[in-house]
């Protein structure tokens, strides 16, 4: 996702409303609906300044979730249920072996959603690159972190982003494919993108990469990106149509 304008805040300044340290919660393997309800509770409390910003670190049992731009043709062909989420984007899958991080962050005014997403991307690009994945970056028009086509594979997404802003507080967040299966993606059109692939860090690096291996580097990178210590840079290696542009929102 490329910003069509300069961000509202200088790149080296924090996008957070508070300078207090972010509180980290490690939730382990947790049901999607339970985590969603918990996010909503925390987002309300954060909007009321009752708690500091939060990072929820977790994995989900296998589940499909559909963002507000999901189309009928995106839906699974294997008969598994889908949870309709209030985040942006289209359909995706979550499951064991995928690191999920939900930042519950009160954003500084004026709220810049595009800059927030790009800072999340920057953090994930840093983490994936530091792991040794060559060329990881952006495809303009598509959010997330991508690996260029290689060894007969097409351009492939290794990390996804889907967010919601409510009362100035961000919720939902990011998912990094570590050592999860890719089988469940075969039954949907992931993120509404039919002409690209999915990958995992384990596949890219040809070794097992656990969720736990990514936790601390991801926490540091997200904290740095939101604070402006890690500055958004140009990591684009391609461009493609935005898969959500001009699509109707689910009511």
UniProtKB/Swiss-Prot annotation:
**EC category:** transferase
Q: What is this enzyme's catalytic activity, as reactions?
A: octanoyl-[ACP] + L-lysyl-[protein] = N(6)-octanoyl-L-lysyl-[protein] + holo-[ACP] + H(+)
Which processes are annotated in GO (biological process)? protein modification process
Entry superkingdom: Bacteria
Gene3D superfamilies assigned: Bira Bifunctional Protein, Domain 2 (3.30.930.10)
Residues annotated for substrate binding in this entry: 87-94, 160-162, 173-175
Q: Which UniProt keywords apply?
A: Acyltransferase, Cytoplasm, Transferase
Q: In which pathway does it act?
A: Protein modification; protein lipoylation via endogenous pathway; protein N(6)-(lipoyl)lysine from octanoyl-[acyl-carrier-protein]: step 1/2
EC number(s) in its UniProt entry? 2.3.1.181
**Where, by residue number, is the active site?**
191
Q: Name one GO molecular function term.
A: lipoyl(octanoyl) transferase activity
Q: Where is this site: Lowers pKa of active site Cys?
A: 157
Domain BPL/LPL catalytic: from-to ranges: 49-230
**Any one of the GO CC terms:** cytoplasm
Q: Name one Pfam family in it.
A: LplA-B_cat
Where is this gene product found? Cytoplasm
**Predominant location:** cytoplasm
Q: Which InterPro entries match?
A: aa-tRNA-synth_II/BPL/LPL, BPL_LPL_catalytic, Octanoyltransferase, Octanoyltransferase_CS
- Fill in the misc note: In the reaction, the free carboxyl group of octanoic acid is attached via an amide linkage to the epsilon-amino group of a specific lysine residue of lipoyl domains of lipoate-dependent enzymes.
Explain the purpose of this protein.
Catalyzes the transfer of endogenously produced octanoic acid from octanoyl-acyl-carrier-protein onto the lipoyl domains of lipoate-dependent enzymes. Lipoyl-ACP can also act as a substrate although octanoyl-ACP is likely to be the physiological substrate.
HAMAP family (alphabetical): LipB
- State the family it belongs to: Belongs to the LipB family.
Question: What is the name of the protein in this document?
Answer: Octanoyltransferase
């Amino acid at each position: 996702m490329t910003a069509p304008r300069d961000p509202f805040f200088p790149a080296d300044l924090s996008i957070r409303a508070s300078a207090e340290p972010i509180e980290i919660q490690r939730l382990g393997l947790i049901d999607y609906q339970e985590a969603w309800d918990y996010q909503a509770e925390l987002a309300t409390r954060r909007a009321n300044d009752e708690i500091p910003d939060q990072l929820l670190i977790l994995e989900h049992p296998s589940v499909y979730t559909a963002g507000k731009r999901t189309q009928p043709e995106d839906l699974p062909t294997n008969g598994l249920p889908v949870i309709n989420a209030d985040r942006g984007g289209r359909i995706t899958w979550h499951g064991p072996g995928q690191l999920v991080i939900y930042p519950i962050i009160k954003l500084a005014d004026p709220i810049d959603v595009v800059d927030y997403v790009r800072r999340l991307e920057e953090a994930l690009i840093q983490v994936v690159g530091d792991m040794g994945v060559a060329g990881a970056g952006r495809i303009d028009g598509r959010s997330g972190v991508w690996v260029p086509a290689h060894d007969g594979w097409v351009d492939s997404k290794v990390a996804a982003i889907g967010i919601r802003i409510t009362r100035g507080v961000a919720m939902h967040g990011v998912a990094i494919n570590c050592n999860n299966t890719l089988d469940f993606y075969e039954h949907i059109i992931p993120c509404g993108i039919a002409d690209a692939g999915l990958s995992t860090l384990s596949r890219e690096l040809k070794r097992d990469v656990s969720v736990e291996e990514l936790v601390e580097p991801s926490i540091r990178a997200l904290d740095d990106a939101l604070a402006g210590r890690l500055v958004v840079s140009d990591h684009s290696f391609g461009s493609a149509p935005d898969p959500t542009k001009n699509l109707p929102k689910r009511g």
